Curated annotation (Swiss-Prot):
ATP binds at residues 107-110, 157. PROSITE patterns: PROTEIN_KINASE_DOM, PROTEIN_KINASE_ST. GO terms for molecular function: ATP binding; protein serine kinase activity; protein serine/threonine kinase activity. Belongs to the protein kinase superfamily. Ser/Thr protein kinase family. WNK subfamily. Residues 499-521 are annotated as: Disordered. GO terms for biological process: intracellular signal transduction. The gene is WNK1. Its EC number is 2.7.11.1. GO terms for cellular component: cytoplasm. This is Probable serine/threonine-protein kinase WNK1. The active site is at 174 (proton acceptor). It catalyses: L-seryl-[protein] + ATP = O-phospho-L-seryl-[protein] + ADP + H(+); L-threonyl-[protein] + ATP = O-phospho-L-threonyl-[protein] + ADP + H(+). Keywords: ATP-binding, Kinase, Nucleotide-binding, Serine/threonine-protein kinase, Transferase. It comes from Oryza sativa subsp. japonica. Residues 27-284 form the Protein kinase domain.
Amino acid sequence: MMGPKANAAAAGDLPEYAEVDPTGRYGRYNDVLGKGASKTVYRAFDEYQGMEVAWNQVKLHDFLQSPEDLERLYCEIHLLKTLKHRNIMKFYTSWVDVSRRNINFITEMFTSGTLRQYRQKHMRVNIWAVKHWCRQILSGLLYLHSHDPPIIHRDLKCDNIFVNGNQGEVKIGDLGLAAILRKSHAVHCVGTPEFMAPEVYEEEYNELVDIYSFGMCVLEMVTFEYPYSECTHPVQIYKKVISGTKPEALYKVKDPMVRQFVEKCLATASRRLSARELLKDPFLQVDDLVFCPGDGDYSLMNYLRQPYLEHAYSNVSMMSNGLSESIDEDTPTEDRWDCEDDDIKADGIDLFNGHEDEPLGNVDITIKGRKSEDGSIFLRLRIADNDGHVRNIYFPFDIEADTALSVATEMVAELDITDHEVTRIAEMIDGEVSALVPDWRPGPGIEESQDTTYCHNCGSNVSSCGSLYAYMSSAARGCQCAELHGRFEEITFQANGEQTDLQDSGGSSDDGGGQTQHVKDQEAVHSNGFVQMGRRGPRDQFCFSSFQEQSCSPRHYEYDTSLQAKGFDMKHEVKMAKYKARKMAHLRRAIHPSLDFDNLNGERRMKSSLNKLQSFHIGKNHNFRIPTCERSPGARDAEEDPDIFNLAYHSRHPDPGAQRARHCEVDAQSSPDLMFTARSYYTGAQLPTNLPRTKSVTLNAVDA
């Protein structure tokens, strides 16, 4: 048992309070938790509750000009301790220190810090977490603005929003500068310039200035940039805000829905929505969506487990991995609505695209559109990674028949794009089309897509990628929407590599004076009878085989050197292919060149040995046609042989996870001429009137 002397000694070792409130309940230490221009936050202790609190001290300086102002301000901040809301920082008490000209108020203390610090600490945040924070902040603002008279914060920013990290809660804090709006408008210019609405500078504003500041907070959350960080002086910020110029960070937001939501918050005062209206905004509506069961109110949605996309993905995988003997074979697939933690990590819609172990922004996706004179829309989707690999995807968009979601789903299925990019690409398409066509109304989202009508003739289990076999079958003879499938034209190249001369490479001779080119460093990929032989040499070599695995002999690849004497020009090959693509896109009913069948609209028959089956591909330095397959003896009728249709399907619908092997690894770098051709196609540059006939290196299959 400790005696009085021991207690006194122990008390002497304890740090002394630097200051005590008038009631003696709260004691302030000298430990500084945070410091701003006019406010310092200290660690303090509540002796009655036995818990640590935050002691906020604000320097008044020139805020108070008379005793009347002091009395008014004291009454206003005294009222703040009556605020009780789960998204408002608890305000225990406050008082004015007249002698030191300070305002002191005691609030709850957060160990996770401010939202800005928390956001910078956790870089990998899902879009649903951001929405969760937005709903909580707006809920707190709605509570403040619903008072009579309304309470406005006047200094809302991420530095004044605090996080309870173990529960994912955010609370609005730093209400020491808030004011009770006793009149119709406030008449004091107070706040942080980067977050102040234009009307604040005019000293004529209402509670909607908090909505403007909230929009800047959302912008900072998704870009990690302070608004108007491009400005070096407050005067520059003032000029931009007054003129209506938005911060440059806004134009770095690639998600059109996020950008549109921020723009609603930054609109002029007459058009700016209230907190109640923003809570009803579609961007924040999550009640109608399907969530994984979890402990919190807001769980991460697993888009790929919805039936609409589950069937589309499973059918492409089924036909690509060879798990079925026939394309039209039914495979039972449950409509899974449950979610696993691993699925959430793998399939969740990530605001910042990439895996956990990859750097932020590993893949950059941009979209750009062009509207022709006849009203048709052409879009280009550009996918680039940090390694310099660039994929340019060109496709038409029919504003009368297409929706962004259907086109994005079709693109993902056909071009082997990461599946969880479906909604991201759809939102980008909606945003670009809206910019080109002002009266365009975005199509239904994923949560609405199940009620939309879909073609079951060309779509296998409502998959937007469709089925070639179903299209070619007699059951789909009257189908029209299948003509849209295969609309995508893709060019893959290395962005920053060593330049090569196309004409020189096209005219180079083979070793041995035109003898058979031997394959070296071959890499074979077998997938349902499709065998691709890649090599690290001046040429790429391909061959088709039947669904039974066959060995491809190097003798199968023999180049016809007679074309070299005719001055084979690769640029004409590219131009011709792009001209064909533009022509078909202009008609809005383009069929991909790799599926060019004779008399498709009539008898839909295929010639023997698939002479018309072609595939245009930009390899290392050459363009060529894929050699025809030797028809199997047992296949007498191509129209009745499902393997042939499977083969045709795989030429257009690659297996997810094997796109690089299927499109040929590009080790050599692209020519500037090739990139210019791609750019010319997009910008609508005029092509020469007299184009030479397309030439291709003939690969004659020779029996071993």
